[in-house]
Amino acid sequence: MDQKKTTVQNALEQNTTNMIFYEDSFTKISFFTREISNCKVPIFYIDFDLQYTGFVKSGITEEMENLNLLHPENGSFREDLKSIIAKISREKSLIVIDSLNGFFNILEGDKDLGRLINSFVMLLSSAANHTKSTIMVGVLSKLNEEGRWVLYNTGRSVIDNEHFTKIQLTRKENNAFATLLNSDNSRDSDLIL
């Protein structure tokens, strides 16, 4: 992509799976809210940290008719995943995983946790690819000394793939910014929010 500004929507449509890196959860919620507000296709919002659900339930964020809020708890995640895969393999949809950190937390204790989560994300990506659906994965993260994205609190490596679009969200004062990243995590271009 050239060094000009591009829209977030154009960046999200480059690949099926989009990694959304952030350090501030309110910036993430603002970004997700903005991106899904104009979405006409079915939306599956997997809310592991329940922040977005709280905003919807309190009326801060409008509840949309095409929005399916899922809170995987009490062992429901695998059933929820099966249902989402069945639906997105038939109809173009938007899938939001909020967040990868919460994904790790809910499955903590499972054997080979990293591989299991990578498999779930790739399974969703494969199903979404057939219908040109879009997946956004929020990741509370930072770059480590080697220039690789790691989960903010645990230091676990973040799933990486050259076919993922990477967007970094930042906040300065009261303004949110989005930057499209290259596969090596260097800055590509600023995105218009």
Task: Give the role of each language-model region.
Residues L81-I88, L181-D184:
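Short, surface-exposed amphipathic charged segments that create phosphate/polyanion-binding patches used
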Residues M1-T16:
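Pre-Walker A adenine-sensing motif
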Residues L12-I84:
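Conserved P-loop
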Residues H130-L193:
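Phosphate-binding/switch region of NTP-binding enzymes
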Residues S89-V158:
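P-loop NTPase motor core
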Residues L50-Y52, E73-S76, N101-G102, S141-E145, ...:
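Conserved nucleotide-binding/hydrolysis micro-motifs of P-loop NTPases
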Residues T61-M64, S89, D160:
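Alpha-helix termination/capping residues and helix-transition junctions
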